[in-house]
């Protein structure tokens, strides 16, 4: 089935008598195999009977509130794409055709009042309040979306699988968007003209909605600034925090200046950083599906794999980058032997990790954990020092050519694969592994 159209309703009989025939005609003319699902929240005006008379599927809302209605609709949907729109005719059903054409550009298509070309015909108070809310949320969550609160959306159903949300009313629209974007799904807006509802009354209570939206906004802000967000690394490069922005750009400058021109490059554990985006002939490898989804829109060759078993043939690369990866993994000799294996003779290894022997990192890590409790510091399970890291790479057949620091805390080393590895029996103690 191509599409499921979800209509959350409470006492919308008069509007459904107009909307459902128009939707049916639209699906027929577009030659779409689709269904219309009316999710009833306890109507008392004959909405259920009217919808059933039009031959569409009607289900009871499981739970209470707009969020519960949306969740019920997602669970009932059988189409490859899921369309949600208001049943009050403020969302012109004819616009579905334009949204359908845009589906190849992203996983979520939003009918937007505030992107260029979009218009909202409503009273000044509601228009001003809506614009203010959308600007606030867009900036708080750092989303490339101008109409965060639009409920007129087309979702790829595969993106909704496993999606869980806690919001119960209209604030759920922002939560859904943040959670999907944090999982690496792409969003596109198409300009849309909004008109007030045709009949009936709105079910939004501004004060209650405002308080619920504030609570949801804070929860989603924490998610957007956690490692769970697919674009965490890229956002850090453009951070509004000067120190974080400097740190990220210094790391990028050192790593890219060493790697550029190296030939075929592997960024192992690339995350969503700009390093892999900035290098020609680079392949990004990452275990997290969300980060891979995010990077696919940048036209970069990508592979999913583990640092413990790199999914590449021997001697496949001229340069391997491992930036801010090894401290997140339990120490194992195979991490370094795998990087050596996929490097060609004379190939370059660029390693970046905090130096736990420096006073700088001992000061910065507690401060970082306090200010950003969801950040990388909480994920560091293996602590390296410069001395121990040199011992390890030397033992695995690398010669250290150069080392650089960021704020005397983060160590970045450039190493060269030697023709003859140092004998394996020359072992050095492994670095201390502790839970950060």
Predicted regions and their residues:
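A short glycine-rich, Lys/Arg-flanked "PGG" loop and its adjoining helix->strand segment in the class I
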Residues: 333-348
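Hydrophobic helical membrane-anchoring modules
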Residues: 140-143, 165-242, 349, 414, ...
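A short beta-strand submotif of the Rossmann-like class I SAM-dependent methyltransferase core
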Residues: 319-325
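Conserved N-terminal segment of class I S-adenosyl-L-methionine
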Residues: 221-313, 319, 336, 351-352, ...
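Structured catalytic core of nucleotide-sugar glycosyltransferases
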Residues: 1-120, 158-163, 175-183, 188-189
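Helix-to-beta-strand junctions that scaffold the AdoMet/dcAdoMet cofactor pocket
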Residues: 103-104, 329-330, 343-345
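Hydrophobic adenine-recognition pocket in adenosine-nucleotide-binding enzymes
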Residues: 89, 325, 355
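Acceptor/aglycone-binding surface of glycosyltransferases and processive sugar-polymer synthases
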Residues: 61-76, 81, 93-170, 197-207, ...
């Amino acid at each position: 089935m191509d599409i499921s159209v979800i209509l959350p309703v409470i006492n919308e009989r008069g509007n459904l008598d107009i909307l459902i025939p128009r939707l049916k005609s639209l699906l027929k003319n577009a030659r779409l195999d689709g269904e219309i699902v009316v999710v009833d929240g306890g109507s008392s005006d004959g909405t259920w009977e009217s919808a059933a008379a039009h031959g569409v599927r009607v289900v009871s809302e499981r739970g209470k509130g707009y969020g519960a209605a949306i969740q019920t609709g997602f669970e009932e949907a059988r189409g490859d794409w899921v369309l949600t729109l208001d049943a009050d005719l403020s969302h012109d059903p004819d616009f579905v055709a334009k949204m359908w054409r845009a589906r190849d550009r992203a996983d979520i298509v939003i009918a937007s009042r505030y992107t260029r070309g979009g218009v909202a015909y409503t009273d000044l108070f509601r228009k001003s309040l809506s614009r203010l809310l959308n600007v606030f949320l867009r900036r708080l969550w750092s989303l490339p979306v101008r109409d965060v609160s639009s409920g007129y959306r087309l979702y790829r159903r595969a993106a909704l699988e496993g999606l869980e949300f806690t919001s119960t009313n209209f604030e759920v629209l922002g939560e859904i968007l943040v959670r999907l974007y944090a999982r690496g799904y792409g969003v596109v807006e198409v300009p849309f003209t909004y008109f007030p509802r045709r009949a009936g009354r709105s079910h939004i209570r501004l004060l209650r909605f405002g308080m619920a939206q504030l609570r949801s906004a804070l929860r989603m802000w924490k998610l957007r600034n956690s490692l769970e967000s697919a674009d965490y690394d890229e956002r850090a490069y453009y951070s509004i925090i000067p120190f974080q922005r400097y740190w990220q750009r210094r790391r990028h400058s050192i790593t890219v200046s060493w790697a550029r021109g190296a030939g075929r490059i592997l960024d192992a554990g690339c995350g969503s950083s700009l390093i892999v985006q900035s290098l020609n002939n680079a392949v990004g490898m990452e275990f997290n599906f969300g980060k891979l989804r995010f990077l696919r829109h940048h036209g970069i060759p990508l592979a999913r794999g583990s640092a413990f078993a790199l999914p590449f043939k021997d001697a496949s690369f001229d340069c391997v980058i491992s930036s801010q990866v090894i401290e997140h993994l339990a120490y194992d000799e195979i991490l370094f032997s795998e990087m050596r294996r996929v490097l060609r003779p004379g190939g370059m290894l660029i390693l970046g990790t905090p130096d736990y022997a420096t006073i700088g990192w001992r000061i910065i890590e507690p401060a970082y954990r306090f200010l950003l409790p969801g950040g990388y510091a909480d994920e560091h399970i293996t602590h390296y020092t410069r001395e121990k890291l040199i011992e390890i790479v030397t033992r695995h057949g690398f010669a250290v050519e150069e080392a650089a620091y960021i704020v005397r805390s983060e160590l970045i080393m450039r190493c060269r694969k030697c023709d003859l590895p140092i004998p394996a029996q020359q072992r050095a103690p492994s670095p201390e592994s502790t839970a950060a």
